[in-house]
């Protein structure tokens, strides 16, 4: 089965072709980071308009890259939610217009399920079951994944997602957009232990997360720097140490909760997915823990940590392979800006 995947939930336009026999044939992505940078964040209307401009050139790119003709495609998968309503509507409209013109069925995909399954795109995918740490700008969850569509939420954030905390911390420190990569880069130049921040809910006894207090601690430190009248090189050094303290605290919590989930479920495989899964400090800490404690940890390729069409094409192929009745042949569709992943559980 050959599936075309279309991702447009936020500020990346992604298209890809995935074949159940041959794997990922082609994928193309356009990021809107440069466009949104001057506003300090995503502007939904601009995001929607840019998806319209980018989708068809990206389609031509993946078709040419893979040598695929439209007659070769069996189905079209698109991100149905969650995400920005306007952006979702663009992708859904393009998917269903192509499906109508080409006489193909469509299937709507949960954006987070795409992230959850994206580590299966590697050459040696992890077998089910596994624990998934889903960590992105909008979500932080620990899931027990038994099979496609068989998900159990073990823990989740009670307030800010980890990626959101990274972005807000970057803004407090005065870094550019997007904040997550910027604060991580700055943290690498900071001195470990120079600034020690709280580890929220580290000893809560459950698998839930909270990052709002960590963000507040960063704000408090910045006010201390201001009161001390730090400037110039001293201020830049203090900011680097603060960034290091923030990243160390966030990573400690994510690793500790992941280890607790593995212990609670007695599973030996951890899958990390979502944009924060590209963070080098997090990967290093989890890999070190895996080597010490004897479990396997799997990550998507760095290029597939961000939103992308490949994960949507994969999820569509896996769903249609198991449940052909999910194929939509009448081209009526809705989008779901708010959509709980747990509702997919079968």
Curated annotation (Swiss-Prot):
Signal peptide: none
Known cofactor(s): Fe(2+)
NCBIfam families named in the record: gcp_kae1 (TIGR00329), T6A_TsaD_YgjD (TIGR03723)
Class of enzymatic activity (EC top level): transferase
Gene: tsaD
Keyword Transferase carried by entry: yes
Protein name: tRNA N6-adenosine threonylcarbamoyltransferase
Cofactor binding note of this UniProt entry: Binds 1 Fe(2+) ion per subunit.
Binding annotation for Fe cation: 111, 115, 307
Regions that span the bilayer: none
Residue stretches in coiled coil: none
Binding residues annotated for substrate, in chain numbering: 134-138, 167, 180, 279
Similarity annotation: Belongs to the KAE1 / TsaD family.
EC number per UniProt: 2.3.1.234
Places the protein is found: Cytoplasm
Job of this protein: Required for the formation of a threonylcarbamoyl group on adenosine at position 37 (t(6)A37) in tRNAs that read codons beginning with adenine. Is involved in the transfer of the threonylcarbamoyl moiety of threonylcarbamoyl-AMP (TC-AMP) to the N6 group of A37, together with TsaE and TsaB. TsaD likely plays a direct catalytic role in this reaction.
Organism: Burkholderia ambifaria (strain ATCC BAA-244 / DSM 16087 / CCUG 44356 / LMG 19182 / AMMD) (Burkholderia cepacia (strain AMMD))
């Amino acid at each position: 089965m050959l599936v075309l995947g279309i991702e447009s939930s936020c500020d990346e336009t992604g298209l890809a072709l995935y074949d159940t026999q041959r794997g990922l044939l082609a994928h193309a992505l356009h990021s809107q980071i440069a466009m949104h940078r001057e506003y300090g964040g995503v502007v939904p209307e601009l995001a929607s308009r840019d998806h319209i401009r980018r989708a068809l050139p990206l389609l031509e790119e993946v078709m040419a890259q893979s040598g695929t003709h439209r007659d070769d495609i069996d189905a079209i998968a698109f991100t149905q939610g969650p995400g920005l309503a306007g952006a979702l509507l663009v992708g859904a409209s393009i998917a269903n217009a192509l499906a109508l013109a080409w006489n193909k069925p469509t299937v709507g995909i949960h954006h987070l399920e795409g992230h959850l399954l994206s580590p299966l795109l590697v050459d040696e995918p992890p077998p089910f079951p596994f624990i998934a740490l889903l960590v992105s700008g909008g979500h932080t969850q620990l899931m027990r994944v038994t099979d496609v569509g068989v998900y159990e939420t073990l823990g989740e954030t009670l307030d800010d997602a980890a990626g959101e905390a990274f972005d807000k911390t970057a803004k407090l420190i005065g870094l550019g957009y997007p904040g997550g990569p910027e604060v991580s880069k700055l943290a690498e130049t900071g001195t470990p232990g120079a600034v020690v921040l709280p580890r929220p809910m580290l000893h809560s006894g459950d698998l839930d997360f909270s990052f709002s207090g960590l963000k507040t601690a960063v704000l408090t430190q910045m006010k201390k720097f201001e009161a001390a009248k730090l400037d110039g090189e001293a201020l830049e050094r203090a900011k680097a140490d603060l960034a290091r303290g923030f990243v160390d605290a966030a990573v400690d919590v994510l690793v500790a909760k992941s280890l607790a989930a593995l212990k609670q479920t007695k599973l030996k495989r951890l899958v990390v997915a979502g944009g924060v899964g590209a963070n080098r400090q997090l990967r290093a800490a989890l890999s070190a823990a895996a080597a010490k404690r004897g479990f396997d940890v799997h990550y998507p390729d760095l290029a597939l940590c961000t939103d992308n069409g490949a994960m949507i094409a994969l999820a569509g192929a896996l769903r249609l392979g198991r449940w052909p009745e999910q194929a939509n042949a009448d081209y009526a569709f809705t989008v779901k800006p708010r959509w709980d992943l747990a509702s997919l559980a079968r």
